[in-house]
Amino acid sequence: MIENLISHPHHIKLVGDFFNKKLFSSISTDHPLVILTDVQVAKEILPPIVDFIHSLDYTVVPLSFPSGEKNKTWETFISLQNQLIDHDIPLGSTMIGIGGGVVLDMVGFLASTYCRGIPLFLVPTTMTAMIDACIGGKNGINLRGLKNRLGTFYLPQDVWICPEFLSTLPKKEWLYGISEAIKHGCIADASIWEFLHNYGDMLFSSREILSEFIKRNCLVKAAIVAKDPHDQHLRKILNFGHTIAHAIETLSQGCLPHGLAVSVGMMIETKISLESGIMKNPALLEQLHHLSKRFHLPTTLEELRDLIPQHLHHEFYDPENIIHALGYDKKNLSKKAIRMVMMEDAGKATSCNGIYCTVPKMAILYEILKSECYAMCNN
């Protein structure tokens, strides 16, 4: 089964079986086919994939790099560029990225810059990658610990979403991706929340429910990206929860899974929206909390304590350090004007005069972060 799910801003297909030669019909066999993944994915699923692509008469060049956000660095990027040169990869070759969000970020940046751009295909293998990272063409690497500081907008020619790849993951990694779906419900489509309430228990057991879940989330993000492909206004709402998330990921030195950081970030940014008077209904905060807990997602900084190395606790649980890290967010116009997305109602981010992010009062931001850190220090 190959279902054409989305054609704009780029093609996305829902695929029942990756081992289908029709998927590769648009890729020439005249040039090498580069496959980029991380070492974990390479170990778990790559050998049969390489064998299959070889059987289609392609010259396959598999490349991999160490897994995890810690390795999404300039050094890794340059190493991979050098490997492409060492393999004499010519202009006209195609690159396929297979993996989670870190792999898709890296392969997009690699493909967009090698020979000023070579054709790119994406095969997401995690929930986060399937409903978020594979859509919209953003890519990038971290620099000096700052999230995605270098990157480009570079659309893939096609994305192949094969839910069967999720079966290779522990269930906790499925849950990391749920936070991005909850985000879509917060900012754009409240029916995502309703879907999770009604069918959440069946996501792991029903192929039909899982496929529908992936479709709905892809459609939400693709619709937003299509209206603002270069992140000038509306697309910024996809950063809901991510302003706080990126700051605490930086302070964790790459030890904090992105989905868990986003879950906590959404709760904190919802509190800021409420205290700032942008969100009028306090019941939404409780609803967000209950939905997150249903999927065993953290909602406070305190719940992250076991994931943060002990020697980083003092720095991590300091509101001033978090605010300092927030100052480096890419949305900011200056370090003193920290911009973030505010939730106005379920399924609606506030437009803030068409900018879709605003600067909360520093006193509100500090007090909420202080409360979060104080709760940890007193337990």
Curated annotation (Swiss-Prot):
GO cellular component: cytoplasm
SUPFAM superfamilies cross-referenced by the UniProt entry: Dehydroquinate synthase-like
EC number: 4.2.3.4
Binding residues for Zn(2+): E180, H242, H258
Principal subcellular localization: cytoplasm
Described purpose of this protein according to its UniProt entry: Catalyzes the conversion of 3-deoxy-D-arabino-heptulosonate 7-phosphate (DAHP) to dehydroquinate (DHQ).
Similarity comment text for this entry: Belongs to the sugar phosphate cyclases superfamily. Dehydroquinate synthase family.
Protein name: 3-dehydroquinate synthase
Organism of derivation: Chlamydia abortus (strain DSM 27085 / S26/3) (Chlamydophila abortus)
